[in-house]
Amino acid sequence: MKRNCNRIRTVLAVACLAAASGAYAEEIGSVSTNFRMTGSDKVVIEAYDDPQVDGVTCYVSRARTGGIKGQLGMAEDPPEASIACRQVGTIAFKGPIRQQDNVFSERMSILFKVLHVVRAVDRKRNTLVYLTYSDRIVSGSPQNSVTAVPVPAGTVIPVK
């Protein structure tokens, strides 16, 4: 009996950690793609505010697996994702930023797969470029999506 309680606690702790990994994502909407009695598969739209650049929000759409495993955070979501980043306010930098930096990441399975959003600076065009891709412990996915946010003329991108 005590052993079963420990297993339940472990599963709940892992599920809580998986849910907490997407703390910066704000779900904007979703559509069901496959009905299941225990929760449908969906395409979700999430917003991520760039933590180093005020006034820039990235919108990521990706598949999320339903069912019991999906509800517990144990399902492996497909690696496909699309990204669109936009200027949503006055662009202001909180400090110098790296030439290239992994600015967001969210687990797509309980242990193995992570969705990344990387920001790169195109100094020549005064533009922030955002790339999304997924990886896993053994191999990543070549599927990716890219978007760019031009920074207004006169605003210098402070690069470390």
Which positions does each model-derived feature cover?
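N-terminal signal peptide c-region/cleavage motif recognized by signal peptidases
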Residues: 20-25
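Structured domain cores in non-transmembrane regions
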Residues: 63-111
